């Protein structure tokens, strides 16, 4: 699952590396972004590996009827925690699911509650990885990678 499709860049990268039988469900609330992503994914020849869904995560998540082994969160930073909790309560993420939260370094001030949940709730084993922001040598960002217990 990808929360935040934008133009499909991450969807192309993720779907090009997943197993043959796997599929990425990518959710975005912006219809224009979905249209651009659809073109990019099609151009990459990966349209059979990506299911694009238009709507907010809080609308779409309750409709999902599968378990995810990987979740990439890269949408509105204030929604990271609430959407993660929704995935938990809907039992979409179970033991050993990897949750990859992007851009938590440059938005760290908005991430305190998210960090507290994945680091201290006992539900996850979590680690933060810092690196230079893509295409910017002077700005650092981070990702938080959490494995569901």
What label would you give each PLM region?
Residues 1-58:
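SAM cofactor-binding core of SAM-dependent methyltransferases
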Residues 8, 34, 60-62, 80, ...:
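Conserved protein kinase catalytic core
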Residues 14, 37, 61, 83-87, ...:
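Hydrophobic packing residues within well-ordered alpha-helices of enzyme cores
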Residues 19, 45-47, 65, 94, ...:
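Short, well-ordered coil/turn elements that cap or connect secondary structure elements
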Residues 49-107:
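Active-site segment flanking the S-adenosylmethionine/decSAM binding pocket
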Residues 81-149:
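C-terminal substrate-binding/active-site "lid" region of AdoMet-derived donor-dependent transferases
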